[in-house]
Amino acid sequence: MESKSGRFPFPFQPYPIQESFMEALYTALDQRKVGIFESPTGTGKSLSLICGALTWLRDYEEQRKQEAARLLEGQKDSDVVKEKNSNSGPPEPDWVSEFVQKKAERDMVNKLKDEELKRKKREERLEMIRHNAQLRYAMKRKADEDDEAVKLLQLSREGAEPETHSPEEEGLIVAEYESDDEATPKSRLCDDDNDDDDDLEEEHVTKIYYCSRTHSQLAQFVHEVQKSPYGDAVRLVNLGSRQNLCINPEVVRLGNVQMMNERCLEMQKNKHEKRQKASDSESKRSRGLAKATCVFSRFENLMAMKDEVLVKVRDVEQLIQHGRETHTCPYYSTRMSIPAAQVVVLPYQSLLHASTRKASGIKLKDQIVIIDEAHNLMDTISAIHSAEISGGQLCRAHSQLSQYCERYRSRLKAKNLMYIKQILFVLEGLVRTLGGKVGQNPNTQSCQTGSELLTINDFLFKAQVDNINLFKVQKYFEKSMISRKLCGFAEKYEGSGINTHSSSKNKENRRTEGLGRFLQTLQSKPTDVSEQQMAVEDKPIMASPMMLAESFLFALTNANKDGRVVIQRQACVAQSSLKFLLLNAAVHFAQILQECRAVIIAGGTMQPVADFKEQLLFSAGVTEERILEFSCGHVIPPENILPIVLCAGPSGQQLEFTFQTRDSPQMMEETGRVLSNLCNIVPGGVVCFFPSYEYEKRILGHWESTGILQRLQSKKKIFQEPKKASQVEQVLSEYSKCIQRCSNIGGGQTGALLFSVVGGKMSEGINFSDDLGRCIVMVGMPYPNIKSPELQEKMAYLDKHMPHVAGKSPGKALVESLCMKAVNQSIGRAIRHRGDYACIVLCDHRYARTGTLQKLPEWIRSSTHTHATFGPAFASARRFFLEKRQKATL
């Protein structure tokens, strides 16, 4: 089915707002705009993005084909004219410019011919794979045979003797380093010596990069593509981390993504070295076991799966299944598929972080980027480019590198030693800023508690490392891969003391045998069982803390005005930390905006957008003319939503949840009375949002002691949002079952009441559709902690670098925007489809201010009613649900 205009293929007749969305999207892509698109949850935003963007891409590719055909035809005509004029008189005086023009035309035609040839070869190859079932069966049979071979190889290794000491340690030593060497290392993947293979030189076709926050959101998008009219024809690649796509058991068992990355890269390096030394093995027999390599990254298999990935749209689970069936790495094959793909689906980190982007093989020049769920884009960019490291991790990194240097000193070149000593010097300075000393147990080193916030330059002076060129140190980290070497070194020697096989190395062994024991003493050991569980869940230990140190040092290369360093001193050095805070997100987003043909920033609730444009777009050099804004209403009729600003409670108490008044018994009891009255008239589920966990704990404690909680329990079964993400699904399931049970059997309880926290597990990404959320209650205004040093510094930065609007400082505007974005995310989950309905109650008289109301989404703002007293508000809510019940019985 197509839209009414006939322009956009769609799986069903689209709503008018979806047509408008796709038209605006098409215009933005065609005119190279930066688009800000707001489409509420439940309006089919994902499908509109898919059909609108892929329709433009289809038209663009067709236009390119026609232009190429015209140019090629014109070249033939030009050759005929050139033959006729070959015997004419002497050349014109401007023959040089004419020659240059003709050469440019010939080059363009040759490029077009080359592109057309590659395109035809690619399409023929994919078509053959798509329709040749016999070929697919042969590939699967070959994979099964390979699987048997792998099992036999593993069995043969089990009885083999361990590798001798020397060859194993060879891989831990950094290669000779030349700081001015700019040569790009060759790919570790290529097992084929044919460098002029067409596939390896494949150019990137025009494509759409779609990114979102979570893997579940990306999976949902892929499923929408599969169901769309483009599902069978589009070439889509689903990128993920090794944690999501790796199928090698030896790597997967590590669990931690950083450790998985290091092990995988080490295996690729071993394979590369194995190929280089293949000729030597014929004349000289190798002793011991070969270094571990990955059996899933054979080049010919990767090339085959690269094409298979493009033939059919697959989500992550399907990619893993296909990789296991063909014994081929999905992680690398998907990256090899990027050049020919039309759509690349990837998480935020892979797109927004320049180093990750480069490592993934992503090229943004003249491409389309769509960033979905972008309401917190600035915060996301800041978080990705911020870095934090604890005193314990700094001490571990220094200890590991010191003992690494001591062990291999005689085998390290002068340049390597120089840079390693510089890194040790910097780490020592960083520990010193926390009040500690390297070489001592950070758990027993006490320091004066407190926090300090410094500019980058002031921090470097304080650490006494301002004489070190961090840009050269950063380059050394990248070229030498010292963090990875150190990871292998720590893994080899962690635990009990070591004994090498060669007696001549006993002196060296003594230098490192205490490493494992010392590293174990550096790790804090919480005695409380729950603390231990939280430590395991939230802070997995990495084999090489040097990776964290590398990230922190890289962050310090930002411009002085763009970031700050927070020094947080706790009771001991191990628990103290250094945190780099990025203040200017635009500096890292500018490259994306400059390189891409068009950038689409989409979300369910993008309001307020003024600060977004000022801080992220204008600061990155985008002009107002390049920005296209689109905001649509909801698919629901206006009578299906009742937003209420409630200024006072049943007893006439004004509702104002400021820091000074929110803890008063009168305010907490009045809030309980508001909620109790609402629970008496609202069917199904009521979701109540509090501004913080701390306030939720205080008010629930007060309600329990005054009997309010018992009154609420008589009408609604009470559920509370868990603090652990792993328990969210269970609570939601029980909450949903309770509402369904009450709806079916009736009784005293009419549903359930869910207490949640703004910015918590339930306020984002969870849809309270139908009976799950018939009423959303927002208690107070969730302003961020104004006393936070990070927020204060961000406000000061904006006040200094951003213009004042309507007499309001940018810092104050930031605080209000953070508050209202959090509100919009929480209340925007109530309506999920056209037939859904809900009441939204904003409990605080400050919501009635004009400036605050303007920051609500338009589809909510246009229906909002402000009530100075409780009576009329309660009457309108009761009438709203009564009408819905009567309509349902008709």
Curated annotation (Swiss-Prot):
Record Pfam families: DEAD_2, Helicase_C_2
Name the Enzyme Commission number(s) assigned to this protein. Answer: 5.6.2.3
| Top-level EC class | isomerase
Composition-biased stretches (Basic and acidic residues): 71-85
Q: What happens when the gene is disrupted?
A: Morpholino knockdown of the protein leads to abnormal craniofacial and vertebrate development with shortened and twisted torsos, smaller eyes and low mouth positions at 3 days post-fertilization (dpf).
For the biological process aspect of GO, one term held by this record is: establishment of sister chromatid cohesion
Tell me which CDD domains the record gives: SF2_C_XPD (cd18788)
Residue numbers of motif DEAH box?
A: 372-375
Which is an annotated GO molecular function term of this record? RNA binding
Q: What is this protein called?
A: ATP-dependent DNA helicase DDX11
The species this protein belongs to is Danio rerio
